Amino acid sequence: MNELKPLVIGDLVVKKPVIQGGMGVGISLHKLAGAVAQAGGVGIISSAQIGFREPDFTTNFVEANLRAIRREMKSAREISPDGAIGFNIMVATKHYDMWVKEAVKAGADIIISGAGLPVSLPEHVEAAYAEMKEDGCPPAGFSWPPLYLPPSPPW
């Protein structure tokens, strides 16, 4: 049987050319994404209502979702420290820019965007990097997301 070729996107090389779809609200979270990444594919966490389990979700929707983005990414990394893990973030959401920036800061390897054209994605990724630079340094394990590779890191 022929072996499948690895998936190569920029500097990201994924052993198995499988991208797990981002299935929202509560389906594509850290356990599924981490397991897919551990198995050699690309694990995707859905940002759709990601903070629904937070106690203040109904009263503090934005902060609850931002915390959940960080927590889900950290938990997925614990399952697959070296695997390819990213987020599915719908362009049509009111807080698209905030979700993208938080996913980048959390260490996402890739961001997949649908439900609209992600024309502002590079701008939001660049803004997140600028904020990270202002804070002093990138997070542990930082690498440029493969779909937006500037010529050199800003630090």
Feature map (PLM): residue ranges:
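Active-site entrance/lid segments in N-terminal catalytic domains of soluble metabolic enzymes
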Residues: 1-155
